[in-house]
């Protein structure tokens, strides 16, 4: 139902675009540190172990986030998780930009990794759920869009490095890595605004949780589908 009709297809395209926006941010934050690790090592006088700690913190955070993400999604819903994980990106990006030492930077990158680990599986689930079963924009092509989105994010980070390098005065070239990491808060705030405006909870998730009344309400409000749940279905215990 959610993928048929003009209203359903319009909403599905918006959800797919928003999910790809999250993947774009995941890729940007995962790759952004690569451009400034030498400057960070020099500024904080890092040992090889310290450099490894800073560089790997986001990966360890992503592992923990991926493990927590599935549990949280089952408990509170995809939409709530999808909105909350963006807060990790905003807070962590600002903390990275202002980090006074390697420990704060590593901690902020770990928190950012939590956001990546939570966001990516949920984004892929939305891509799969809201894609067509066949024809243009089918599941295979929609899910595969994560790949060019990922490459685009890395390309944008390269362009940002060139831009900031060109505009920063030479006396403040040490700000470059801070600006690149801190810039991640900008798309995160944009994504939060768009998600809050155009997204709702997944009706499929609500139905799978046994909450048929909520699923029907989402279909009516977000997809203009006149869905109602028979009274006898409401009286049956959830599976």
Language-model features: where?
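Transmembrane-helix signature of 12-pass secondary carriers
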Residues: 1-239
């Amino acid at each position: 139902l959610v993928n048929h009709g003009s209203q359903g297809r319009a909403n599905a395209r918006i959800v797919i675009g928003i999910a790809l926006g999250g993947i774009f941010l995941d890729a940007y934050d995962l790759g952004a540190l690569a451009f400034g690790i030498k400057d960070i090592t020099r500024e904080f006088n890092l040992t090889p172990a310290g450099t490894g700690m800073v560089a790997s913190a986001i990966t360890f955070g992503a592992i923990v986030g991926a493990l927590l993400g599935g549990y949280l999604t089952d408990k509170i819903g995809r939409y709530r998780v999808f909105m909350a994980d963006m807060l990790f990106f905003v807070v962590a990006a600002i903390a990275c930009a202002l980090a006074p030492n390697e420990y704060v930077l590593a901690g902020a990158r770990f928190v950012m990794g939590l956001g990546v680990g939570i966001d990516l599986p949920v984004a892929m689930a939305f891509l799969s759920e809201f894609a067509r079963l066949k024809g243009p924009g089918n599941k295979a092509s929609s899910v595969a869009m994560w790949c060019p989105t990922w490459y685009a994010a890395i390309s944008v980070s390269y362009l940002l490095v060139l831009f900031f390098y060109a505009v920063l005065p030479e006396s403040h070239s040490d700000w470059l890595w801070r600006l690149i990491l801190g810039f991640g808060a900008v798309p995160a705030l944009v994504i939060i605004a768009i998600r809050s405006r155009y997204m709702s909870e997944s009706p499929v998730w609500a139905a799978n949780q046994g909450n048929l009344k909520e699923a029907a309400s989402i279909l009516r409000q977000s997809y203009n589908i006149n869905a109602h749940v028979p009274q006898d279905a409401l009286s049956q215990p959830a599976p």
